[in-house]
């Protein structure tokens, strides 16, 4: 059938992964309610009439805190499987984890010295 033997499942998976979003977006476009007045375009604020504008500018410092949080959150995601399998991994994995933690500590010290964690 196929010239490339063994790739049938991969091609089927690729086709399914391509069709699911396309079909989902098409179905939502076809099934959504259309029309509506100007009330539909207003910001929903807990069922109350919105007061003021909908565009709020956040301080750039929030983004720095969020970025540092994401970095250390990803660290937790990487270290959790290592901690679960700690007994089976051995000394090499322990040294690799220490190097990983050391790099992140250096990054934290760098961010601290550059003032990324200062609010004022």
Swiss-Prot record:
Cell compartments where the protein resides: Cellular thylakoid membrane
Any one cellular-component term (Gene Ontology): plasma membrane-derived thylakoid membrane
Swiss-Prot/TrEMBL keywords: Membrane, NAD, NADP, Plastoquinone, Quinone, Thylakoid, Translocase, Transmembrane, Transmembrane helix, Transport
Transmembrane portions of the chain: 7-27, 64-84, 89-109
InterPro entries: NAD(P)H_OxRDtase_bac/plastid, NADH_UbQ/plastoQ_OxRdtase_su3, NDAH_ubi_oxred_su3_sf
Topology class, membrane: Multi-pass membrane protein
GO MF annotation: an example: NADH dehydrogenase (ubiquinone) activity
GO biological process: photosynthesis, light reaction
Reactions the enzyme catalyzes: a plastoquinone + NADH + (n+1) H(+)(in) = a plastoquinol + NAD(+) + n H(+)(out); a plastoquinone + NADPH + (n+1) H(+)(in) = a plastoquinol + NADP(+) + n H(+)(out)
Description of how the protein assembles with itself and partners: NDH-1 can be composed of about 15 different subunits; different subcomplexes with different compositions have been identified which probably have different functions.
Role noted for this protein: NDH-1 shuttles electrons from an unknown electron donor, via FMN and iron-sulfur (Fe-S) centers, to quinones in the respiratory and/or the photosynthetic chain. The immediate electron acceptor for the enzyme in this species is believed to be plastoquinone. Couples the redox reaction to proton translocation, and thus conserves the redox energy in a proton gradient. Cyanobacterial NDH-1 also plays a role in inorganic carbon-concentration.
Protein name stated in the entry: NAD(P)H-quinone oxidoreductase subunit 3
Species, as recorded: Microcystis aeruginosa (strain NIES-843 / IAM M-2473)
């Amino acid at each position: 059938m196929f010239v490339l033997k063994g790739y049938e499942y991969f091609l089927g998976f690729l086709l399914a992964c391509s069709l699911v979003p396309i079909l989902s977006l098409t179905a939502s476009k076809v099934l959504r309610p259309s029309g509506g007045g100007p009330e539909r375009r207003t910001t929903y604020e807990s069922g109350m009439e919105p007061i003021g504008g909908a565009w709020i500018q956040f301080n750039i410092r929030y983004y720095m805190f969020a970025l540092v949080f994401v970095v250390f959150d990803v660290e937790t995601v990487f270290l959790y499987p290592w901690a679960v399998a700690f007994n089976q991994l051995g000394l090499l994995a322990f040294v690799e984890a220490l190097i990983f933690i050391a790099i992140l500590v250096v990054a934290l010290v760098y961010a601290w010295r550059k003032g990324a964690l200062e609010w004022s």
